[in-house]
Structures are given as structure tokens and as C-alpha cells.
């Protein structure tokens, strides 16, 4: 999978999980201690996440990082 497609797919998986929790981007970004604009770029697939950042996002969503990877067929 190309990196751009991977990041877009991961961002969509993260967005889907956040929306299922009925939490706004701003509220979620605050919850995980991240600036909203940066978090928004993650959901759009415009940021290459470090493992640490992916872990913060997954923890905020209440899932394991592996579950997010499965959501986007990695």
C-alpha cells in the first residue's frame, strides 16, 4: 500500500471511530492533548504519525493500535 493511501485510510479509520463516540474533533484533540489543527490533519491523512502519536490516538479512542491497523486493512 502506498504511503499516501495508507495515511488516508488510517485517518478515515480514526475519524470513523471518533464519530462513533459522538465526540467532536476539538473535544477529542483536547482529550488526547493535541492541537485541533494537527489532529484534523491526521484524520485527513496529511500527517505521518509516529508510534507515540498513534498510541495516544488509539488510547483516546479506547482501542489498541492494532485495531486501527485492521480497520484500514494494514
Predicted ranges, named:
Residues 1-19:
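A short, Lys/Arg-rich alpha-helix, primarily the initiator
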Residues 52-67:
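DNA major-groove recognition helix of helix-turn-helix/homeodomain DNA-binding modules
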Residues 67-74:
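Short amphipathic recognition helices of helix-turn-helix/homeodomain-type DNA-binding modules
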Residues 21, 50:
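Flexible coil/turn residues that form the inter-helical turn or adjacent wing/linker of helix-turn-helix
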Residues 12, 36-37, 51-54:
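Short alpha-helical elements of helix-turn-helix
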Residues 19, 30, 59, 70:
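Alpha-helical residues within the helix-turn-helix
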Residues 22-44:
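Short alpha-helical DNA-recognition segment
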Amino acid at each position: 500500500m502506498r504511503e499516501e493511501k495508507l495515511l488516508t485510510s488510517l485517518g478515515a479509520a480514526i475519524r470513523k471511530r471518533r464519530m462513533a463516540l459522538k465526540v467532536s474533533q476539538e473535544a477529542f484533540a483536547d482529550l488526547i492533548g493535541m492541537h485541533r489543527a494537527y489532529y484534523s490533519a491526521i484524520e485527513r491523512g496529511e500527517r505521518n504519525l509516529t508510534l507515540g502519536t498513534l498510541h495516544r490516538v488509539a488510547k483516546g479512542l479506547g482501542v489498541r493500535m492494532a485495531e486501527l491497523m485492521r480497520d484500514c486493512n494494514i
